Amino acid sequence: MSYPASPSRYQDMEYRRCGRSGLKLPAVSLGLWHNFGDATLYDNARGLIRCAFDRGITHFDLANNYGPPPGAAEENFGRILNADLRAWRDELIVSSKAGYTMWPGPYGDWGSKKYLVASLDQSLKRMGLEYVDIFYHHRPDPDTALEETMAALDLLVRQGKALYVGLSNYPAERARQAFDILQRLGTPCVIHQPKYSMLERGPETALLDTLEEHGVGSIAFSPLAGGLLTDRYLHGIPQDSRAASGSRFLQPEQLTAERLDKVRRLDALARQRGQKLSQMALAWVLRGDRVTSVLIGASKNAQIEDAVGMLANRHFSEEELAQIETILL
């Protein structure tokens, strides 16, 4: 039986323009960094994708190395797309990235034209697609000229393998240089993907200003600080949690008494607002208009429902914003 997409899927979602481009992204996007590799039950991953699309999440964010093993998330997404969403391809924004190690030898990572072109070809094959909507360079390459890396992105757009290009993890000055090169080539950068949350505010120093000046949108990854900005750690470290398992994404030493106190105070404010801490944390990242979308991960449908439900209460009073600043000092 074919998947019957919800006819009301666009009802509760907000779509925000990506910088000065014509592209709009949902305020909440789904990242396939975790929970979509071969270690995950395929039926659960399929259910998450369906749930997301039914709630108006049209943007699915991948990378060549997402798994495990590397490539598995793209393969599984391709299977789900072919089984359920092929009829709605024109309603989807599919993004992928390349920059981290993908195969052995001198051509399997970083930012050479050789690597980026081969990587996207492989990603398209894994997903069964003719093109991706957004293709990112995943991290700056210290050894390859920025002109070569940006020329590779431009080439992939001209070849019809990507509609738009973006950058991830680039610091402000390096991003500015890349934007200028891409503009000269005629393929402007439309989006930047930084790590940004209440507990990771580095982009506020210079990056968000740079994006605004160049008309580039942004999509924040890890907006919940690896799960710390949820109710998961309010009373310590659960045995089945990411921190307890020794995950490199959330180490026990990150859960200091001072940081946990901040999280508890933020949770109290969220409850005053009538929402969960995770919802308030996502809404805070989306405050104003400098962040286009928040990139969530999910292992359960309820997490997607909560994230989309945040949109019904995403605005803050000046007093609430001041309270948050006081807590985060």
Task: Map each language-model feature to its residues.
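Short, acidic/polar
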Residues: 39-52, 111-127, 175-179
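Acidic-and-aromatic substrate-binding clefts and catalytic sites of carbohydrate-active enzymes
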Residues: 36-41, 65-73, 141-145, 172-173, ...
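Alpha-helix N-cap and loop-to-helix initiation/capping positions
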Residues: 40-44, 72, 76, 107-118, ...
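Active-site groove signature of glycoside hydrolases
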Residues: 124-144
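Beta/alpha (TIM)-barrel catalytic core signal, keyed to glycine-rich beta->alpha loops juxtaposed to Asp/Glu
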Residues: 2-12, 142-329
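N-terminal binding-site loop/beta-alpha segment at the start of enzyme catalytic domains
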Residues: 1-92
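Hydrophobic faces of well-ordered beta-strands that scaffold small-molecule active sites
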Residues: 26-30, 60-62, 92-96, 135-137, ...
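N-terminal small/glycine-rich loop or linker at the start of catalytic domains
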Residues: 19-37, 95-108, 131, 136
